[in-house]
A protein has these predicted regions:
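N-terminal polyanion-binding entry modules of DNA glycosylases/AP lyases
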Residues: 1-121, 189-236
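Short leucine-rich amphipathic alpha-helical surface patches
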Residues: 21, 149, 165-172, 187-188, ...
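Catalytic DNA-binding helix-loop module of base-excision-repair DNA glycosylases/AP lyases
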Residues: 43, 48, 100, 123-169
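A general structural motif at alpha-helix termini
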Residues: 61, 75-78, 86, 123, ...
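Short, charged, surface-exposed loops that flank catalytic or proteolytic processing sites
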Residues: 69-70, 116, 171-179
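Short, structured loop/turn "capping" segments at alpha-beta junctions
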Residues: 110-114, 139-144, 155-157, 172-175, ...
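Short amphipathic alpha-helical surface patches that serve as generic macromolecular interface elements
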Residues: 158-165, 177-185, 193-200
């Protein structure tokens, strides 16, 4: 299929989605907890959406926020503990937890705290490169933070969204996710990218499987996670 035909299929799909689903709100991650860096908040939520869905991510984030005091505490959780907080049957829970913990740890090392607010003032290309270079961060997560937290031009894709688009012949089925993201960002104007992504997430919301509501989260902890002091400023 030619690039022109592929573009036609993409725009036809987006046109149909506008009639079938309501796009998610740009702020569907919810407001960050008081005192929390909003970019870090979007980073954590983006990890939960990756290869899952927005409803699953929202539920998991609620459980995590009940169980820990702040996002810095997530950094010192063990991966299995983090995975249990996400909820029973959460997709790729252990891998997701391992990646999230690695990313938060590297943010802490680079910034001397769990904060990414300085990315707001960086050129968007530099901010995206920073996020993509963090250990454990999938391209989807970096692109989503750039799009929704930093106001940059990006069309986040993971394997699930890529497969959905490929089934509609809206992206090259044999290409990589990186290639598809690049093509989408060249094909859609900057002002179109946010709506397109939010439509795709609303579409995924209808298709994604649900997981059980239970999790291994206990009452909110006040001082320690698995024997580590929450207030410590040293590396785990």
């Amino acid at each position: 299929m030619s690039a022109t035909d592929r573009t036609r299929e993409l725009r036809s799909l987006l046109f149909r989605l506008r009639k079938r689903v309501k796009p998610l709100a740009p702020g569907h991650a919810g407001a960050p907890p008081e005192g929390t860096d909003p970019v870090v908040h979007e980073l954590v939520y983006s990890f939960l959406v990756w290869e899952a869905s927005a409803p699953l991510a929202t539920a998991a984030l609620g459980r995590m926020r009940t169980a820990v005091v702040d996002y810095n505490e997530l950094r010192v959780c063990y991966p299995l503990e983090l995975a249990s907080l996400m909820g029973e049957g959460y997709p790729l829970a252990v891998e997701r937890a391992t990646r999230l913990r690695a990313a938060l740890t590297e943010v802490y090392r680079r910034e001397h705290g769990t904060m990414l607010g300085r990315l707001i003032d960086l050129p968007k290309r530099d901010a995206r490169a920073y996020l993509e270079a963090l250990e454990g961060v999938p391209p989807f997560v970096a692109a989503r933070v750039v799009l929704l937290a930093l106001g940059g031009h990006a069309v986040p894709l993971d394997a699930m969204l890529h497969g959905m688009l490929a089934a509609e012949e809206a992206v090259e089925p044999d290409g990589t996710i990186i290639d598809a993201m690049g093509w989408l960002e060249r094909t859609l104007r900057a002002k179109e990218s946010e709506e397109a992504y939010l439509l795709l997430e609303a579409w995924r919301k209808r298709k994604a499987p649900k997981v059980g509501p239970t999790a291994g989260a206990g009452p909110k902890r006040s001082s320690k996670v698995q024997g580590r002091s929450r207030g410590s400023e040293t590396e785990p």
